[in-house]
Amino acid sequence: MQHRDEILTPSQLNTLARDLLESAFPLVWIEGELGNVSRPSSGHLYVTLKDAQAQVRCAMFKPKSQWLTFQPREGLRVLARGRLTLYEARGDYQIVLDHLEESGEGALRRAFEQLRIRLEAEGLFDPARKQPLPVHPRRIAVITSPSGAVIRDILSVLMRRFPLVEIELLPSLVQGDTAAAQITHLLGGADSSGRYDAILIARGGGSLEDLWAFNNEQLARTIAAAHTPVISAIGHETDFTLADFAADIRAPTPSVAAELLVPDQRALRQHLGQLQQRLLHLQQHRLDQAIQRADQLGLRLQARNPEMHLRLLAQRQAEAGRRLQQCLHHVLDRAQGQLRNHHTRLYALNPRQQIAGLQKHLKHLNPQQPLQRRLQQEQLRLHGLVRALEAVNPLATVARGYALVRRADNNTLVRDSAQVCVGDVLDTKLAHGQLRVRVEISST
């Protein structure tokens, strides 16, 4: 007996039941007779599927029901596929249908599923085998009926989007006993010719029996083995054939297939305009870089130009000469200044000048001072100056028995025997007279 803590509400119970149903029956096929057919203004389809013993409610919502190729009616025997679920508000379980066909197609549907499973197990539908569509195809082969809305829609879209593409129609039956063989033959020939960048196989909508030519095993194998990319556009969006599984690309409609095959010329023009602008900017940038590089190389070349180098050396030489001249002038000015200073000092130390000054001073002596004493002082001072003058007079030294010796060639005063060599001629100044002698012996 269930514990009271586990008591459920009706909503909880219905939710649990719904989850169990959906997990146990994710997808079911059911065959029965239609009853209670209702199609309100919303576009949804509500029916009852029944047999002699039971019935089950079914719903097909507008996105699926609008593609039905027949008119559901009371008593019609159908084959349905859907997901089992529970309508929680009433506690009723129902099937949400995604496929509904007349019951005569049931055998075809089972044959289709068996063949699809077998080919899929062989790897015929492996995504790794798929080829990408060309970005800018030049020639496209279209295998379809030469009359009808399909080829008109395809040509209209292709010419509008990319009128430069070349389109070749390979007319074929798209329904009937011989259609599959004819489509297979045209596809094989188009692929082996190597003339086409892509091949489009297209047909309008129809029942499973109408589309049965595209569930042919040989056609599916030819599509999978093709070296040319193949795009299929067969029936409506809800219709799937073996040709769709084998093709490199499956389009929901022929018009969409045409859009997938070629680029939009308006987008291409816009892209080309953008590329042109980028190219112009890039060219201008490269040109600016080249000009800048040329300017730099010109400056470097100019800096290494021998003529420029010589001019630079000449400027440096002129500057060095100017600085040397300034330096010489400065040295001469300093020497002349020092010479003037020495001359002034020597002039001031000249005994004759001092005597003249003293004599001038004597004239201005105060007559009130004792003249005799003043005169004696000045005489003593005069005698001292005379002695000082005689002391520095070289002639006085000569008078005491010495001699002044000079080189005869340059009149240089000789103070050291190292200044002369044997054979040199010397002039000797004596107290009375002068001698010219030749050196025979020289010693230190």
Curated annotation (Swiss-Prot):
GO molecular function, one term: nucleic acid binding
This protein's GO CC annotations: cytoplasm; exodeoxyribonuclease VII complex
Keyword Nuclease: yes
Keywords (A to Z) from UniProt: Cytoplasm, Exonuclease, Hydrolase, Nuclease
Reactions catalysed, as given in the entry: Exonucleolytic cleavage in either 5'- to 3'- or 3'- to 5'-direction to yield nucleoside 5'-phosphates
TM spans (from-to): none
UniProt main location, coarse: cytoplasm
InterPro entries: Exonuc_VII_L (IPR003753), Exonuc_VII_lsu_C (IPR020579), OB-fold_nuc-bd_dom (IPR025824)
GO biological process, one term: DNA catabolic process
Cystine bridges: none
Subcellular location: Cytoplasm
EC number annotated for this UniProt entry: 3.1.11.6
The family this protein is said to belong to: Belongs to the XseA family.
Subunit structure: Heterooligomer composed of large and small subunits.
NCBIfam families the UniProt entry points to: xseA
Cited function: Bidirectionally degrades single-stranded DNA into large acid-insoluble oligonucleotides, which are then degraded further into small acid-soluble oligonucleotides.
The protein, known as: Exodeoxyribonuclease 7 large subunit
